[in-house]
Amino acid sequence: MRDRFIPVQIALPDNIAFNLIGHAFNVKPAAKTDWNILAEDLNDRVKNSRSKVMAVTKIDNPQVMKDIMPLHPMAALILKNIASAFKSNQRSMFDFIKSSNTDDVKAFQWFIENAGPYDDHPLLTVDMLWNFFYEKGRDNLTSDIRLILDTFPQQQNLREDEKAVLKAILIMQAIDQRLGGTVDLRSEEHTSDPVT
């Protein structure tokens, strides 16, 4: 018997996704003035990545990028696309942003409770998506994505910075695989440091 429904792919445009991410971040009114200054500083640290992500996502308003701070622009782009790696989209960008700040989940709320704008790594980068989407969501990954990400546990004796770079590369490779090469991956100048 034939299915009664025709599957339809609904894709959220990148520029709208970035607006939604920015609107999902709620800065406490008492901290708003200070945060605007800090967000400007954080935004200045990622000029190259910001301009490349803006070009790829067709975002022409720099305020959109400032509004997603402390989320690195590339992490935001990957976050927007990551739900496609899950069998039924159990983990979405909004789940990541709004999940409670428990140590075992290590999503956005955990990050803002445990990191700050004056830390050595003040931005939530692509490698920091690993715990939420791989460690805690591995069972819901499609097999092709799991195959790529399962490469990481096989690696031994890596330094922490090497682990961060490998996690970022594997996440980007997995998302690129899922989307059939439609995600503009970072250039060589960026893969040496997942924060820039």
Feature-to-residue mapping (PLM):
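Conserved P-loop NTPase catalytic core
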Residues: 1-110, 122
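Terminal-proximal interaction/regulatory segments of ATP-powered molecular machines
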Residues: 150-188, 192
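Secondary-structure capping and boundary motifs in well-ordered enzyme cores
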Residues: 67, 71, 137, 157-165
